[in-house]
Regions:
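Amphipathic alpha-helical interaction surfaces in cytosolic regulatory modules
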Residues: 22-78
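Short beta-strand/loop segment at the start of cytosolic alpha/beta domains
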Residues: 1-15
Length: 78
């Protein structure tokens, strides 16, 4: 799994490429969480155009980031 990050004001765009599964979910989650907290991100776009597979760990990453962004009063798009 590769992930590129882009910033558009208070919006973080995470472009993922590959398989989002148990082997990389924790790393993806930690990277996004760190960026949200470090840069005061309130909106998150997760670009899954190049994701070929996602298991329940990946769904957990999505749900967790949604809750985090919602608590900040922001929006998340997938």
């Amino acid at each position: 799994m590769e992930m590129r990050l882009e910033y558009l004001g208070s919006t973080l765009v995470a472009k993922l490429d590959g398989e989002l599964d148990q082997s990389c979910a924790a790393e993806i989650r930690e990277r996004i969480d760190n960026e949200i907290n470090l840069h005061g991100i309130t909106n998150l776009v997760m670009d899954f155009n190049n994701v070929s597979f996602m298991d329940s760990s990946g769904i957990g990453v999505l749900i967790g980031r949604y809750k985090q962004i919602k608590a900040r009063g922001g929006k998340m798009l997938v």
